[in-house]
Amino acid sequence: PAVLPEIMRLFNQTAMEIYEGQQYDMDFEVRNNVTLEEYIDMIRLKTSVLIGCARKMGALIAGASEANAQALYETGLYLGLAFQLQDDVLDVWGDEATFGKAIGGDIMNNKKTFLLIGAMQKAQGDDANELRRWINNEYALRSEKVPAVTALYERLGMREAADEAIKRYDDMAFDALSRVEMSDEAREAFVQLIKGLVGRKK
């Protein structure tokens, strides 16, 4: 097919970006100065580009124009960002029975999420000292650490900050989707997919 070279180029580019994102994620484990901008870039590379790649490949194979294929790529990119941020939120405030795994795993592992990085940037005085104590306490009990750090997140407004970021990327995904020429039926299917992934509880 005529689109094969473009598909192979996109595949190779995406593979390299995912490797890069995974390396960033590993590097973040030993860094205490990770910024929210770096985190967003990491999840873009590790997660979002794969969703964008899948959408663009499908569009190209189906004979879509470059403009439509690129808009679908961007839809996937922003959807991936919103999806990962929602995952960060669910790990703290989700319902265990619905989420399908224990809540607070990221907190117990000091995983650099949108919530922890934002809290580290915003916390001052007693809040900063308390957050550092929990991060440095290797023997903290889940029953104590998770509620305490969750309370810190709430006090620092991190739930609201995450929800705002999710909505921003959700809106950007819909904006990109609005530029795609497709039937009303196909558009509605994409709309429901975006709503389902971003509004998920598990």
Label each PLM-derived region with a short phrase.
Residues 1-202:
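All-alpha prenyltransferase/terpene-synthase fold signal
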